[in-house]
Amino acid sequence: QKFCTLDIAPVCCQIVIGGGMYTAGNACMCEGFVSGVGRCENPKECPCTREAQIPSCCSSRWGLVSVTGKCACDCLGGTVAFPEPCPSPY
């Protein structure tokens, strides 16, 4: 559980480990990881602003991708393969 305030706005959220960004109103609304303060350069419209940050492995058209929750996986048009990060390919 992280403490946060509602005075940081906007922030750029990374919904997918390794890519996939969207702009949130503030850090408290970021479903993924805050990658920077301010709007994303290439924001992805995505309603993933209220979901708990639960790492999941998402089966998408790019293969298995680690994401921060089911909503982020849905944003990729994928389905959750299992509720933990994907195994590393290395």
UniProtKB/Swiss-Prot annotation:
The modification Pyrrolidone carboxylic acid is found at residue 1. Keywords: Disulfide bond, Hemagglutinin, Lectin, Pyrrolidone carboxylic acid. Disulfide bonds join 46-71. One of its GO terms (molecular function) is carbohydrate binding. The keyword Disulfide bond applies. The N-terminus is blocked. Lectin with specificity for complex N-linked glycans and O-linked glycans. Has hemagglutinating activity towards rabbit erythrocytes. This is Lectin-1. It comes from Hypnea musciformis.
